[in-house]
């Protein structure tokens, strides 16, 4: 889901 992706990006900003 988008929520999971957004959370992942926030936790691991490349």
UniProtKB/Swiss-Prot annotation:
Expressed by the venom gland. Keywords: Acetylation, Chemotaxis, Mast cell degranulation, Secreted, Toxin. It is found in: Secreted. One of its GO terms (molecular function) is toxin activity. The keyword Endoplasmic reticulum does not apply. The modification N-acetylserine is found at residue 1. One of its GO terms (cellular component) is extracellular region. GO terms for biological process: chemotaxis; positive regulation of mast cell degranulation. Its main location: secreted. Disulfide bonds: none annotated. Venom component which lacks hemolytic or antibiotic properties, but produces an inflammatory response via mast cell degranulation and produces a chemotactic effect on leukocytes. This is Polybine-2.
